[in-house]
Amino acid sequence: MASILGVETLQHTNGTTAATIDSTGRILTPARPAFHARYSSSGTEGVQGDIVFNEEDFDIGSNYDTSNGRFTASVAGIYYFCFEGLSAGSSGGGVLADGASTEVCFHKNGSQGAWSSRTYIYTQGASNYITASVVDIIQLAASDYIQVNVNSNYIYSDASGNYDPTFQGFLIG
């Protein structure tokens, strides 16, 4: 004897929709927050402190704010974040001097926690630009925010758009 279970909507225990099944049998889930932002400048420069990535390539859920550089979680969960850019030695975008360093990290709710991944770049033997990259998987409650912070030296950007630092992230689950 065959049994048929007719389901159109799956709900979380708090009553929010987890998934729906359309008339063709496809399972549809609510959009998951995801974004990709970049820092774009009109000239050659170095940026420091909390970085405000002023252009968005996409922002599913409208969680990234180009006015303050923060991704604010609208949904509690586990998130993946990534930053990439070139380190610079001055606010004018100059190369890192021999023996100089740059530190880049994620700040959660305005501070760097013990959990936070960071990259610490140190030049030795030559003045140059060096790629900086930070990746982390972070648990956020709804309304927690993440931003990128450069603690020492600078991150490089120029008007060509070829060297725009980027910040991206998405909800894993």
PLM features: what roles do these ranges have?
Residues 12, 22:
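Acidic surface patches and DE-rich sequence motifs
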Residues 5, 13-16, 27-173:
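Extracellular jelly-roll beta-sandwich "head" domains, especially the C-terminal globular C1q domain
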